Amino acid sequence: MKCLRWRSNRHRIYLLVACGALFLLNRHLTQEESRIDEEDEELTQVDVNEDDKKIECEPPGSIESKCIADNGKSMKCWKDEEDVYFPVSYLKKRFDMTGKLGKDGSTFELYTSYAKMRSPDSTYDPLGPFGHFSTYSVETRDRVRCVSAKTDVPMSTQWDPIPYYYPIQISQYGLQHYSRMKLDSISNKSEASPKDDVILGVNSKEWKGAAGMHETTERLFFNDEQMGKVVNISAGAALANAGAYVYLDKSPDLHVISFDWKPYEANSSFTVLAKMKQDDLLVLINYVYSEGNGKCVWQEEERISDDYIVQKPKKDGQVSYSYSYIGNSPIGEWSTVTRDLLVDVARALSSGDNRKKDDNVVLHAGDLRLVSLGFRGELTVKQKITQRREQHSHAFYAAADWLVKNQNDRGGWSVPVERSIAERKLVLPPGWHSAMAQGHGISVLTRAFKHFNDEKYLKSAAKALKLFKINSSDGGVRGEFFGNIWYEEYPTTPGSFVLNGFLYSLIGLYDLSQLELMIDENDETMRAKIQEAQELYSAGVRSLKQLLPLYDTGSGTIYDLRHVALGTAPNLARWDYHAVHVYLLKWIAGIEKDEVLSKTADRWIGYAYGKRAKHN
């Protein structure tokens, strides 16, 4: 039995790990895990200092006893002549601790926080990698239903079972891939490197046709003035038809495919066949012009009768799923397709109707290999199919482009589903805006402006400022707390005053304010917008300095200030949110060169390692 030794006379907690049969009770201790909400960080298990990692065990020499804590129920404990030993299961719950037993079974590691406290490695760069977002994996979060084949950005089911576009999630997806792209360029790695890419389909002999008279496939090869070497395909549109196909490279690292095609009819489709390494399961991923009953990915159905349709079971070691491709490109026009099959297969396998939260499938490079790429219907394909390791530039472009195309007249990206807070004491109807979404969106767009050298991104970023000047009660994101302005992640009435969303909005405003040197000196309109961003940022920082102490509990931080208006208990921040507060506060402190903010962040780091504010 894992126990913790309580030395009241020394005010310290020591660990006692028992041996023998009691060791089998190890299953009672599980490491606390908490997936962070998609608007914040994904953090790894904390590393404690080397001096604190190992706590030597002493011989038990104790007898079983009965203990009562805070007038609660009695529990089994142990005592010897000097000390009393409490079960970790009790201490974990009572003191919000966590821990784990080492692999060798002789060492127990105790944590106050399950989240690692990070500080920025360098001064914040408005055009550089976005913090440690490069370690994110937005597309594998359990609330992400798919990366849409229509728009190439993630769709969420966090607050509604029907997939929808959540602006914060989309921006984080873009910032994740931008950060990876920048770090790859720093380390002289390029996703476009010829040595990493494999080009297929150039040779006409690589294009195979379906066998059997009932599956005839016509392939006509010619040179197109615009696209060069192409193949015109005419094949049966049924998904059961193999169509015209090309065998793909077997390397498990090359899980991203890219090609150009022009479909002529709505029944045109393409399919990637992948093989799982673990069980040799064959997975068919079809991309079709179908709405899918509101789903972005679904398992193919089998018609038993006119009134009875069921999902196709796993048959002969093979399953089939489809992604909705409607809206990606008009029929009869050329478009470029780029898909990461590692993501698409994982999202498909996680998409069953009876899926539970813990059924989320996450695949890693090496877990599958691509077998073939096939086409059906009437279409033309360029004879250049590219396989590569990553798609960072494309994913970043997709996110930035989505922001430009989906920005409304007020400069915002609205959330199309209801959001309820505090047991529905605060409710935001569909169509609400978020200051965090505005800030994240600006951070994506300013980087896209520099990376792609396209002013449409700069104009969109400038347009996003409008909602920062509109009150929450009027559909904007501007709130007020004791005379201090606040940019609301959730613009409820009364306000909720979420800390992390406010800090992210400040970073977005700062990003735009730093583009002055990149703007034409004769562009007075845009220069005025840059100045406006600076003023909004400065006003927010002034409020931060005034209100920040309200978020400090002396042992952790508070997520928001909803309790002030609602008269409820404070909403304490989980340790992963606490880690976000620390990181963002360090960013702002570095930008402002503010010693008070920096020391506050340092104090908050101490809370994660068991330090507490002094008593009176």
From Swiss-Prot:
Instruction: Identify the EC number(s).
Output: 5.1.3.17
UniProt-recorded name of the protein = D-glucuronyl C5-epimerase
Any one Gene Ontology MF annotation carried by this entry is:
heparosan-N-sulfate-glucuronate 5-epimerase activity
Its job: Converts D-glucuronic acid residues adjacent to N-sulfate sugar residues to L-iduronic acids. Plays a role in the early migration of AQR and PQR neurons, which descend from the Q neuroblasts.
**The keyword Glycoprotein belongs to this UniProt entry's keyword annotation:** yes
GO cellular component terms, semicolon-separated: basement membrane; extracellular region; Golgi apparatus; plasma membrane
Q: Where is this site: Critical for catalysis?
A: Y136, R143, Y559, Y577
Which residues get glycosylated?
N188, N232, N267, N471
Q: In which tissues is it expressed?
A: Expression in comma stage embryos is strong in the hypodermis and intestine and weaker in the head region. In late embryos, larval, and adult stages, expressed primarily in hypodermis and intestine.
What the record says about family reads: Belongs to the D-glucuronyl C5-epimerase family.
Q: Where are the transmembrane segments?
A: 13-29
